[in-house]
Amino acid sequence: MGQSPVSLRLLSWLAYLGGGAVMVAQAVALSDGRQRVLPLALLLAFCSPYPVRFAIEGKSYALLVLLVALAWWWRRAERSVAYGVVAALAGLTHFYGLFLMLAAAAWDGASRRWHLAGAAVLGAIPALGWIIYSADYLFSARSGSWIGPPDFALLEESLARALGLWPLPKLLLLVVLIG
């Protein structure tokens, strides 16, 4: 296989398939035996444009989705050790995973599910340690130099992927209909 587009994206594809499978299994487990849940969950997990787009990139977004889906699975099963380990991996994969796990810890703490809150907080320690270790770089001007300035065209392109051509009038119509 060597260095090819396929080998570059293979991990993302596998993570996307794994994350989608976990999400579908979670939906079926929560469905209480309703027959339409499986095909709908399969459709949403494997035909949505956003996960498909992230699965074809050579980045860690699909891995983050897999880890967060596993974290929710173990959290629902109240398996604190597995939840904490996967929360740690999600936090180390992407900052969004860290903040999502900390939000879940706050929610679990407010709900007095101390074992789950503790597992998520303990799972956050490696990522918080990494942030402290790399703070000099993260807060320097050179850390975000590869990110372009905010651009209205990027917003419109993202909306067009979700809503189709001419997304702004459609979004305005949607806001008017909802409001």
Predicted regions: what they are:
Residues M1-S31, R36-G179:
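Membrane-proximal helix-loop-helix interfaces that form the catalytic/acceptor-binding platform
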